[in-house]
Amino acid sequence: MPPKKRMKNGSSLKSTSKKGEKSRNIITIQDLFSKREAQLTDTPNKLLTDHDQSASDYAYALKLQQLFDSENQATAPEKLPKDVIIPEEEYHTDTFNVVKESNDKPKENLVTSEECKASFFSTDSVNKDSTIDYDALQKDPLTYVKSCRARFVSKDTKSFSYSSLANTFSLISSTKSRIRIVTLLTNFLLTLLYADPDSLIATVWLCTNSIAPNFYGKNLGVGPAMYSKALKEVCGITASALKNLWNKYGDPGDVAFEAKVSVRTLSRPEPLTIKKVYSTLLKIADSNGNGAQNRKLELTKFLLISSNAEEVRYIGRSIMQNLRIGAVQNTMLASLSKAFFIFDNQNEIFNFNSDSLQQQFRQGEEIVKQSFFQVPDYNILVATLLREGIENLKDNMSIRPGIPVKPMLGSITKNLQHMLERLTDHNFSCEFKYDGQRAQIHCDRLGNIKIFSRHLEEITGRFPDVIEVAQLALKHSCDFIIEGELVAIDKSNGQILDFQKLSTRERKKVTVADITIDVCVFVFDIMFCDGKSCLQMPLIERRRMFFEHFNLIPNRFQFVSSLETNEEQSIQEFFSLAITNKCEGLMVKVLNGTNSKFPSTYEPDKRGEGWIKVKQDYDDEFESLDLVPIGAWYGNGRKAGWFSPILLAVYNPDTGAYEAVCKCMSGFSDQFYKELTQKYSLESGNSSLKPIYNFCETGKVTPQIYFAPQEVWEIKGAQITSSPAYKAALGLIQDDRGLSIRFPRFIRVRSDKGPEDASTNSILADMYMKQLNT
């Protein structure tokens, strides 16, 4: 891909007028957005309803607006030119303060109930600067970009209103086609690249139902009770009426929309911008200390008051972290790569033939994904794309201490014999697969150590003993990233303890004196060492690198037990030894070689043939799966008053959907049933009588209560079967039938995994095909 000069932010497009002709009028963003001009007729002023709070609510919103504006004027940083490269030392600083907000005066217009109830295009037409041609937005990006580059100038434009994004969300929510979702996202991102690139980062986070990477530790902390209180105060709705809305709709956005639909205010709030919504969510997350709960409540009310029509629906979902429009990680990365490739190559792109263009799109997407998996932070990704473009992305985004790497994953196999058949003619190592918590240990050049979980959350405060032992084991000062399993252990005899022992350790602010359960770090890889990435080294060289820089400390800091042989009997004995030592089985890894199907390099976020799991099976045929509870029925007889059975699902990473796979009612204790029923009671806010998520695919199975996907359970069964009732892996094996699990049994809660770390639909399909070929 030849390098292209990037268009500098703020530069206008060259005039297309010929010499001697009058310059053509440049069509501004306002002209582009005029296609769907407001069709609302003026509505006579109406009296306020008996909700007397509305006037004071608006005054309160204005007060908060003025407060935000004064804060922004005092703290807004000077904008950096695009050719400035951020020093590596500054990557760990808070990048959120780059978000700027409009200081425009609010307009004084009466909002009537008719306007509140109007369709979203009509309501959105009030904000003319952000009324996008939504018909064009749904067209092929190459068709869309022709109008974009001819009409936009990228200077002197206003920040996009949130309504433009909410309207796009509505279009995305109307389809489950990944191609159409990518098209809509690509075109909206292209619009921002031309007209408002400063809103790109905020847009990406809002689209992905997040406000920051997991390792930033930023959580909104707005629970169902606070959200309901905000709705009651903003909308003047009673608790019983609000409960009825929850029972009827189950979705926080739909509840907010219906609760606010008849609310009238004296004046129309200032239109929310994309950056304003995002920065307010950050303020909610950053509210700590005395008065934090009240501050969060006030900010939540501000967003609800300031939003109208479709805006309130999606703001409500964002506040409750329940957006679910299908813009999952892979979809967003594909959309970003396509938008930037088109923008960077806008003068040449129409010269590509179709096959060449698709190849360029695929290459660009692969570059963006590889870069993001090494540095999984949209703040850095988008900023680097804006500055460098796709062609220079890999050189400017590589693994570094302090930012966790997306972990490499192991593929599944039926048994040792099958593994040996797959790895014929390859040198490999068999390692104990310990039953602990997978973790990355990072050390920067100053000796500061951080620890991250497998789903990229920082857990440093939970393991002060690991920090201590990592410092002791290091032979000489250098920066590094190592990966291993944190395993509960009896240090007196080296005996490995059950994983449940480790889960009892406190999660925050643990001191060495507080520790009652000791851990041993069983290292199995090194990804960065002494200023250099080790990802492209074969495993055998990465091991050598580890032993050159670290000493082993018995029962505290060890390398995984491993065996290098192709002899089946020796491997079988080693497997038995692993089970005797309370391990889950073996992880078999290719040591060297350049075969792309069996890589010996470290491949972030990939489940390749270079790592193969061999686990002890429940019935010697069925490997366990990590499933997500998404619903339940009310129990009968002895289980009356509890939830039983429980509906479980696999995860589809392409759509973000949780696909129902089976009902489980075996393996639970009475105490577990009691705790589960309390956790997912209707009063908890973790469940609903209606589907909470649009992307929970239950097929022909209808539970009596729906759970918010939030935890992972390890499940074993007897067999995978084809099913017309369940949606799991639908289309991967048969177009009209999904897959289900016979005789599922609960094993344990996987507290080290989040819902998106659950077993995927493709894993289930692979297991089914292996079962058929047995």
Curated annotation (Swiss-Prot):
<dbReference type="InterPro" id="IPR016059">
    <property type="entry name" value="DNA_ligase_ATP-dep_CS"/>
</dbReference>
<dbReference type="GO" id="GO:0006273">
    <property type="term" value="P:lagging strand elongation"/>
</dbReference>
<dbReference type="GO" id="GO:0006310">
    <property type="term" value="P:DNA recombination"/>
</dbReference>
<dbReference type="Pfam" id="PF04675">
    <property type="entry name" value="DNA_ligase_A_N"/>
</dbReference>
<keyword id="KW-0436">Ligase</keyword>
<dbReference type="GO" id="GO:0005524">
    <property type="term" value="F:ATP binding"/>
</dbReference>
<keyword id="KW-0539">Nucleus</keyword>
<dbReference type="GO" id="GO:0006281">
    <property type="term" value="P:DNA repair"/>
</dbReference>
<dbReference type="GO" id="GO:0071897">
    <property type="term" value="P:DNA biosynthetic process"/>
</dbReference>
<feature type="active site" description="N6-AMP-lysine intermediate">
    <location>
        <position position="433"/>
    </location>
</feature>
<keyword id="KW-0067">ATP-binding</keyword>
<dbReference type="GO" id="GO:0003910">
    <property type="term" value="F:DNA ligase (ATP) activity"/>
</dbReference>
<dbReference type="Pfam" id="PF01068">
    <property type="entry name" value="DNA_ligase_A_M"/>
</dbReference>
<dbReference type="InterPro" id="IPR012340">
    <property type="entry name" value="NA-bd_OB-fold"/>
</dbReference>
<dbReference type="GO" id="GO:0003677">
    <property type="term" value="F:DNA binding"/>
</dbReference>
<keyword id="KW-0547">Nucleotide-binding</keyword>
<dbReference type="InterPro" id="IPR012309">
    <property type="entry name" value="DNA_ligase_ATP-dep_C"/>
</dbReference>
<feature type="region of interest" description="Disordered">
    <location>
        <begin position="1"/>
        <end position="25"/>
    </location>
</feature>
<dbReference type="InterPro" id="IPR000977">
    <property type="entry name" value="DNA_ligase_ATP-dep"/>
</dbReference>
<dbReference type="InterPro" id="IPR012308">
    <property type="entry name" value="DNA_ligase_ATP-dep_N"/>
</dbReference>
<dbReference type="InterPro" id="IPR012310">
    <property type="entry name" value="DNA_ligase_ATP-dep_cent"/>
</dbReference>
<dbReference type="GO" id="GO:0005634">
    <property type="term" value="C:nucleus"/>
</dbReference>
<keyword id="KW-0235">DNA replication</keyword>
<protein>
    <recommendedName>
        <fullName>DNA ligase 3</fullName>
        <ecNumber>6.5.1.1</ecNumber>
    </recommendedName>
</protein>
<comment type="similarity">
    <text>Belongs to the ATP-dependent DNA ligase family.</text>
</comment>
<dbReference type="InterPro" id="IPR050191">
    <property type="entry name" value="ATP-dep_DNA_ligase"/>
</dbReference>
<dbReference type="InterPro" id="IPR036599">
    <property type="entry name" value="DNA_ligase_N_sf"/>
</dbReference>
<dbReference type="Pfam" id="PF04679">
    <property type="entry name" value="DNA_ligase_A_C"/>
</dbReference>
